[in-house]
């Protein structure tokens, strides 16, 4: 929901948004975003890593990241250029079927996992890895978890392959690490500032209000979460307004009432 007032509502004010948005003929540029933004960057970055080093650890990690990103692309579009991208210096690559892409990705994950497992004690420097601070074992668990996720996505169309990949992903025999099992295994890039705090306070001085759309539903159902989400409004008795949870209409630049 949009909690808007003052700076937080800038994009919804008339001078920025107003009536310039088309409700009935919105842009469809988003349909190609994964092709235009994700695929070129992923392939280019993968090639940059291979050109910069022969170290199998960063190359394997880059391979895992490539699969993580492009698995979403093939999930979205189905057939995509994949297995022959960049081969022999060609600028054009044929499309692979979604099955071919998935099978190739499984092979790449397996290769990366095996390579990292052999080199599991040879961590990267923390500055070179903003996700796991160079911890190779964390990347192995991430790759196995990604393999498990992909295996579950094909369980109704390719049960045999799915079962094989699931067993490989969760296998902890003979010192294998298996999948992520605790919060410390989560893959994320830490930020120094909480983005929600930045939006609600740094940008807006704490003047963040519940929208009328949200408060009307919550009031109608007497939602007990209201006391957690906000505080009750306070009005002068002369205004003949009952104090409670009153949301602001989306787009108000300067709220008259608080709460």
PLM feature spans:
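Single conserved hydrophobic/aromatic residue that forms the stacking wall/gate
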Residues: 1-12
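Structured, solvent-exposed acidic/aromatic patches
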Residues: 13-65, 69-259
